[in-house]
Amino acid sequence: MDNVPLVIASGNKGKIGEFKKLLDDFPIDLLTQPVGFEIEETGSTFMENARIKAIAVSQATGNLSLADDSGLSVEALGGAPGIYSSRYASSDKQRIEKLLAELKPFSNRKAKFECALCIASGEKVLIEVSGFCEGLITFFPKGQNGFGYDPIFEVSGLGETYAEMDHEKKKHIGHRGNAFKLLIPKLKQLLGSMKK
């Protein structure tokens, strides 16, 4: 059987690269959403936004679609930036600077990354899973790898930021990796049922 086309509902190059590495062993052809395709994220949770994106891209392309919505929630900031993580400021550098400035008055630096994944076919949701990673916000950026808030998110118990880790390590302990650990058996089952 030919590979199944799966459209990644994202224009984020860092995220697309991670998805490709995480799904490397699957009989799927990973495609990216149409250039310029914009989806308004109107959900109030990461999962609602992932669902909105997966359905919209699947309906637009006629293929299965995989969407994620993920972000950083900082305890002292009442969960901010949360679902607004990518819209917190206009660049990664500015987002990091803004978050560090807002955290200055607080001693509590606990944070968690969450990744909600959704696979849809047309308007039907086929799979939904969420993964998490607990950590702390550092006082300054550390490391050169990754993207987004990776340089200021130190994983609990490891003393390393995401940006200090190589891809393999981040894949095994990170929020997206944890979500994919839950997604993969369900995706295998889905692909198996499509072959019948």
Curated annotation (Swiss-Prot):
<feature type="binding site">
    <location>
        <position position="70"/>
    </location>
    <ligand>
        <name>substrate</name>
    </ligand>
</feature>
<dbReference type="Pfam" id="PF01725">
    <property type="entry name" value="Ham1p_like"/>
</dbReference>
<feature type="binding site">
    <location>
        <position position="69"/>
    </location>
    <ligand>
        <name>Mg(2+)</name>
    </ligand>
</feature>
<dbReference type="InterPro" id="IPR002637">
    <property type="entry name" value="RdgB/HAM1"/>
</dbReference>
<comment type="similarity">
    <text>Belongs to the HAM1 NTPase family.</text>
</comment>
<dbReference type="GO" id="GO:0009117">
    <property type="term" value="P:nucleotide metabolic process"/>
</dbReference>
<protein>
    <recommendedName>
        <fullName>dITP/XTP pyrophosphatase</fullName>
        <ecNumber>3.6.1.66</ecNumber>
    </recommendedName>
</protein>
<dbReference type="GO" id="GO:0035870">
    <property type="term" value="F:dITP diphosphatase activity"/>
</dbReference>
<keyword id="KW-0378">Hydrolase</keyword>
<dbReference type="GO" id="GO:0036222">
    <property type="term" value="F:XTP diphosphatase activity"/>
</dbReference>
<dbReference type="InterPro" id="IPR029001">
    <property type="entry name" value="ITPase-like_fam"/>
</dbReference>
<feature type="binding site">
    <location>
        <begin position="175"/>
        <end position="176"/>
    </location>
    <ligand>
        <name>substrate</name>
    </ligand>
</feature>
<feature type="binding site">
    <location>
        <begin position="10"/>
        <end position="15"/>
    </location>
    <ligand>
        <name>substrate</name>
    </ligand>
</feature>
<keyword id="KW-0547">Nucleotide-binding</keyword>
<dbReference type="GO" id="GO:0005829">
    <property type="term" value="C:cytosol"/>
</dbReference>
<dbReference type="GO" id="GO:0017111">
    <property type="term" value="F:ribonucleoside triphosphate phosphatase activity"/>
</dbReference>
<dbReference type="GO" id="GO:0036220">
    <property type="term" value="F:ITP diphosphatase activity"/>
</dbReference>
<feature type="binding site">
    <location>
        <position position="170"/>
    </location>
    <ligand>
        <name>substrate</name>
    </ligand>
</feature>
<comment type="function">
    <text>Pyrophosphatase that catalyzes the hydrolysis of nucleoside triphosphates to their monophosphate derivatives, with a high preference for the non-canonical purine nucleotides XTP (xanthosine triphosphate), dITP (deoxyinosine triphosphate) and ITP. Seems to function as a house-cleaning enzyme that removes non-canonical purine nucleotides from the nucleotide pool, thus preventing their incorporation into DNA/RNA and avoiding chromosomal lesions.</text>
</comment>
<feature type="binding site">
    <location>
        <begin position="147"/>
        <end position="150"/>
    </location>
    <ligand>
        <name>substrate</name>
    </ligand>
</feature>
<feature type="active site" description="Proton acceptor">
    <location>
        <position position="69"/>
    </location>
</feature>
<dbReference type="GO" id="GO:0009146">
    <property type="term" value="P:purine nucleoside triphosphate catabolic process"/>
</dbReference>
<keyword id="KW-0479">Metal-binding</keyword>
<dbReference type="InterPro" id="IPR020922">
    <property type="entry name" value="dITP/XTP_pyrophosphatase"/>
</dbReference>
<keyword id="KW-0546">Nucleotide metabolism</keyword>
<dbReference type="GO" id="GO:0046872">
    <property type="term" value="F:metal ion binding"/>
</dbReference>
<keyword id="KW-0460">Magnesium</keyword>
<feature type="binding site">
    <location>
        <position position="40"/>
    </location>
    <ligand>
        <name>Mg(2+)</name>
    </ligand>
</feature>
<dbReference type="GO" id="GO:0000166">
    <property type="term" value="F:nucleotide binding"/>
</dbReference>
<comment type="subunit">
    <text>Homodimer.</text>
</comment>
